[in-house]
């Protein structure tokens, strides 16, 4: 798919589609998109009148293409615009356009007859899918493997997918995989789409420490925003199936079809394709509907100031030094993860005799066993045997 620079019209389409979702807070959406409410409501009225973003299954009174030759030309035109799309997606696009499309098998035969079919390398492996019941309960975040650009630099694509709707809330062309880079990109994404309840990530950097520790400064930043960080089981990439599938689609529909010169060029290509993916491309896991049909922005807005963790009166609270990884309790020093240097933590009794937990807000980050001073360390994360897919 040849890319073009994302226009104001593309942003308008996304705004109107999200604003027309049931229960959408339209005034808040105007604020997040940086447009005046009067302008936003005008766009919404035009979108509803034109029907461009309404019920796409509603057919017009007369089909724009009825002849066999015209339908075949339309099938091939869609395929040429989106070379990675198969018969099912093309059939759905014909249906949305109000064209009396032939059977999916006929669409496939049109593609085969016109040399648009490439034999698959092997059969797909069926997997049981799990998903959250509503948008923004879980976002899956990952880096696709880096790609070499025309100027010789590396591009590290950062991908963020809403688990329920498969809506791509973020597709960023990054120069590295550092926590600060991700944090900067997320701030812009949060201001547009709001905050998720949790992120699902793997165990590598920047979500995990290279030394094997679970917590990083980036993760602490998310906790302060009230966002949980869930890690997949080690050596089980299939538990992040939505990310893996998205990465394959990105490779087939962007990298395989475009030679990207540099990072700005890559970001333009990502932005253009992201609009297609969210608003136009039928998704098999969604019954050939588009992700935008199931997504709505979070009601939790990005705060102007980073909230500080609060503790109840009477709790045992300690300040972790900025240069050491210890807090004092009962006359001894107890280790905490390095990521919490300079933060305030609470020490709370656990159900185990003589045991205490060190907490950052509601999250236990380390443990204390007064009967065995040597048995002190970070709390290992309890990962469900059924990780989100």
Predicted regions span which residues?
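Short, amphipathic alpha-helical "recognition" segments used to contact nucleic acids or chromatin
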Residues: 7-24, 72-81
């Amino acid at each position: 798919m040849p890319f073009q620079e994302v226009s104001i019209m593309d942003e308008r389409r996304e705004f109107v589609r999200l604003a027309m979702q049931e229960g959408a807070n339209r005034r808040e959406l105007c604020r997040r998109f940086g447009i005046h409410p009067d302008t936003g409501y005008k766009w919404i009225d035009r979108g509803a009148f034109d029907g461009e973003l309404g019920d796409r299954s509603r057919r017009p009174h007369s089909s724009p293409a009825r002849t066999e030759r015209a339908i075949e030309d339309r099938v091939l035109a869609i395929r040429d615009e989106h070379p990675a799309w198969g018969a099912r997606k093309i059939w759905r696009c014909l249906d949305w356009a109000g064209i009396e499309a032939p059977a999916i098998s006929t669409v496939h035969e049109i593609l085969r007859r016109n040399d648009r079919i490439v034999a698959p390398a092997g059969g797909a492996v069926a997997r049981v899918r799990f998903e959250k019941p509503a948008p923004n309960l879980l976002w899956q975040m990952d880096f696709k493997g880096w790609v070499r650009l025309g100027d010789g630099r590396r591009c590290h694509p950062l991908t963020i997918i809403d688990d329920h709707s498969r809506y791509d809330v973020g597709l960023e062309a990054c120069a590295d995989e550092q926590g600060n880079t991700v944090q900067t990109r997320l701030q812009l994404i949060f201001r547009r789409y709001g905050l998720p309840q949790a992120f699902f990530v793997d165990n590598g950097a920047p979500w995990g420490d290279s030394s094997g520790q679970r917590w990083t400064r980036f993760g602490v930043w998310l906790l302060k925003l009230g966002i949980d960080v869930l890690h997949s089981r080690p050596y089980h990439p299939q538990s992040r199936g939505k990310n893996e599938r998205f990465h394959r689609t990105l490779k087939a529909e962007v990298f395989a079809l475009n030679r990207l010169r540099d990072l700005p060029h890559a970001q333009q290509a990502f932005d253009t394709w992201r609009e297609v993916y969210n608003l136009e491309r039928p998704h098999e896991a969604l019954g050939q509907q588009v992700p935008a049909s199931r997504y709505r922005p979070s009601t939790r807005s990005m705060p102007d100031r980073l909230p500080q963790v609060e503790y109840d009166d009477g709790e045992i609270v300690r300040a972790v030094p900025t240069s050491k990884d210890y807090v004092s309790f009962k006359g001894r020093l107890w280790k905490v993860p390095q990521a919490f240097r300079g933060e305030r933590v609470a020490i709370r009794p656990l159900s185990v005799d003589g045991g205490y937990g060190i907490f950052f807000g509601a999250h236990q980050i380390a443990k204390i066993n007064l009967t065995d001073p040597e048995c002190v360390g970070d709390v290992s994360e309890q990962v469900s045997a059924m990780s989100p897919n």
